[in-house]
């Protein structure tokens, strides 16, 4: 495939993203500068979140995405996935619960690291 053909595919993907969501996330904008990176990344995103063969319904998928983005502290991803979740009929209470689950997982992860250090530091006391 020529560089021009790759650029054309990348531009079509960007247009589809903008048409679907009303904006193009910064990550996609930057990655699209290198079609060899952007095209497979966009395909993976579509497979993970929008595939016709997915086992999870869109509401559940986007609740998972909100929880994961929350756990990672990815502010812009929380907003983007939250917007998709709301469009998939997720209620405010459901969204808040997913955010709590993600927050809790992040909290226990940091506690896990910290408390292991604590145990190591004071194991003989």
Predicted regions and their residues:
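Amphipathic alpha-helical segments within well-ordered protein domains
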Residues: 46, 65, 82-86
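Short conserved catalytic/interaction loops centered on acidic-Pro-aromatic/His motifs
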Residues: 78-83, 113
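Alpha-helical scaffolds flanking conserved acidic
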Residues: 57-63, 92-98
């Amino acid at each position: 495939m020529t560089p021009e053909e790759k650029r054309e595919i990348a531009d079509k993907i960007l247009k589809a993203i903008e048409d679907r969501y009303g904006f193009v996330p910064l990550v996609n904008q930057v990655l699209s500068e290198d079609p060899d990176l952007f095209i497979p990344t966009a395909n993976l995103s579509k497979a993970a979140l929008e595939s016709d063969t997915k086992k999870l319904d869109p509401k559940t998928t986007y609740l998972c995405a909100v929880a994961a983005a929350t756990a990672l502290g990815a502010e812009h991803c929380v907003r983007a996935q939250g917007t998709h979740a709301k469009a998939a009929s997720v209620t405010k209470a459901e969204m808040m619960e997913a955010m709590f689950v993600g927050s809790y997982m992040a909290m226990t992860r940091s506690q896990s690291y910290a408390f292991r250090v604590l145990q190591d530091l004071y194991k003989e006391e």
